[in-house]
Curated annotation (Swiss-Prot):
The family this protein is said to belong to: Belongs to the class-III pyridoxal-phosphate-dependent aminotransferase family. HemL subfamily.
Name of the protein in its database record: Glutamate-1-semialdehyde 2,1-aminomutase
Biological process according to GO: protoporphyrinogen IX biosynthetic process
Gene symbol of the encoding locus: hemL
Pathway(s) where this gene product acts: Porphyrin-containing compound metabolism; protoporphyrin-IX biosynthesis; 5-aminolevulinate from L-glutamyl-tRNA(Glu): step 2/2
Gene Ontology cellular-component terms listed: cytoplasm
Phylogenetic lineage: Bacteria, Pseudomonadati, Pseudomonadota, Gammaproteobacteria, Pasteurellales
InterPro entries: 4pyrrol_synth_GluAld_NH2Trfase, Aminotrans_3, Aminotrans_3_PPA_site, PyrdxlP-dep_Trfase, PyrdxlP-dep_Trfase_major, PyrdxlP-dep_Trfase_small
Organism name: Actinobacillus succinogenes (strain ATCC 55618 / DSM 22257 / CCUG 43843 / 130Z)
Family annotation (NCBIfam families): hemL, PRK00062.1
Molecular function, one GO term: transaminase activity
UniProt keyword Cytoplasm, yes or no: yes
HAMAP family: HemL_aminotrans_3 (MF_00375)
Length: 427
């Protein structure tokens, strides 16, 4: 019995499902999850001592690679001063100043401890600011596990939301309208039906929770125009895309300006940090300057602020943004070439430092329904074939992959060699 198997059995005795976040259980791909002992650069090492090239990167934060010296040094320097104060520190100001410089649409920013807190708080703020209740989200887009966002579409854009998780009251979920990603007409119809009721529209600018689905040209701009037309706030959820698709986020890459932005993952450099920010007028509606309440015991934690500042400072260095995108392109295009070589129906979609792998014979995946038509069983086989060869991909056909600056040309070539073998088996 492997150490991972033994640990998983032990974990299930005291942790629901043996994990602290569901996707880690390998339920989507089958088998026993890999338990990690340590990580450095582009590599993770499991509890049996096997090393893997990692394309999960803690689900996005490790854009510099694991255990980056600049981040570790910043954390070690901060720790002797104390772990938490529950009071303001200079570090949170410095990180906020950097975030506002990198993302110009953010004039004021509030630190929290997770991406879920960021999106949840941004939506509460939007509702309070507009004095409206309904929100729009998109089928297949995930914005954390707050109640109003755990809703998936019924048949058609105008169907009132139904809870997609037990424990979410239908009376609460009915305020969430679900539209089709990359379909402006579905958004227009929702606004036309509830012209005075929609507080905000929240969107992943690149849908990374149905693998990796970029927006069609003009889609984000069209959403922006509809929000303006009907007086709703546009919230761009950059928890995954922020600082990864581009240094200024996907909003900079695609040229669209939101009213509010949610951040997470990279902003903490591996520590638990989220943030939401936007126009000064709107952000001043949050307590203590305004009536909308939001608080957090560990918000602005000094150790987490030090890690986040070190990460963004390093990532901001000239050439890093382009280098990250080039590495991602090298991997994705290489995979497409190998799949074609072996006659395996497959496409790879990518933007900046994130990518998605789809086993399908269509040339492009543009929404959740397209994703659901992909061959999940074939992805699962591919995942395990790669895992056996020391390549750790996201253990789900519905999750994006993440490149880091630590991945070398040799790492990518080794990954492609493993993929060549895997595609040969799948052919």
């Amino acid at each position: 019995m492997s150490n991972s198997t033994a640990l998983f059995q032990r974990a299930r005795q005291v942790i629901p499902g043996g994990v602290n976040s569901p996707v880690r259980a390998f339920k989507g791909v089958g088998g026993t999850p890999v338990f990690i002992q340590k990580a450095a650069g582009a590599y993770i090492t499991d509890t049996d001592g096997k090393q893997y090239i990692d394309y999960v990167g803690s689900w996005g934060p490790m854009v510099l690679g694991h255990n980056h010296p600049a981040i570790i040094d910043a954390v070690l320097k901060a720790v002797p001063n104390g772990l938490s104060f529950g009071a303001p520190t200079e570090g949170e100001i410095t990180l906020a100043e950097l975030v506002c410089r990198l993302i110009p649409s953010i004039e004021l920013v509030r630190m929290v401890s997770s991406g879920t807190e960021a999106t949840m708080s941004a939506i509460r703020l939007a509702r309070g600011y507009t004095k409206r209740d309904k929100i729009i989200k998109f089928e297949g887009c995930y914005h954390g596990h707050s109640d109003s966002l755990l809703v998936k579409a019924g048949s058609g854009a105008l169907t009132l939301g139904q809870p997609s998780s037990p424990g979410v009251p239908e009376d609460f979920a009915k305020h969430t309208l679900t539209c089709t990603y990359n379909d402006l007409n579905s958004v227009k119809c929702a606004f036309e039906r509830y012209p005075q009721d929609i507080a905000c529209l929240i969107i992943e600018p690149v849908a990374g929770n149905m693998n990796c689905v970029p927006p069609k040209p003009g889609f984000l701009q069209g959403v922006r125009e509809l929000c303006d037309q009907y007086g709703a706030l546009l919230i761009i959820d950059e928890v995954m895309t922020g600082f990864r698709v581009a240094l200024g986020g996907a909003q900079a890459y695609y040229g669209v300006t939101p009213d509010l932005t949610a951040l997470g993952k990279i902003i903490g450099g591996g520590m638990p940090v989220g943030a939401f920010g936007g126009k000064r007028e709107i952000m001043e509606y949050i307590a203590p300057t305004g009536p909308v309440y939001q608080a957090g015991t560990l918000s602005g934690n000094p150790i987490a602020m030090a890690a986040g500042l070190a990460c963004l400072t390093e990532l901001s260095k000239p050439g890093n943004e382009q280098q990250l995108a080039e590495k991602t392109q090298q991997l994705a295009e290489g995979l497409k070439t190998l799949a074609k070589k072996h006659g395996v129906p497959f496409i790879a979609q990518y933007v900046g430092g994130m990518f998605g792998l789809f086993f399908t014979d269509v040339p492009e995946v543009t929404n959740f329904q397209d994703v659901m038509k992909c061959d999940v069983a074939k992805f699962n086989r591919f995942f395990h074939l790669m895992l056996e060869q020391g390549v750790y991909l996201a253990p789900s056909a519905f999750e994006a992959g993440f490149m880091s600056l630590a991945h070398s040309d040799a790492d990518i070539e080794q990954t492609l060699k493993a993929a060549d073998n895997a595609f040969a088996v799948l052919a």
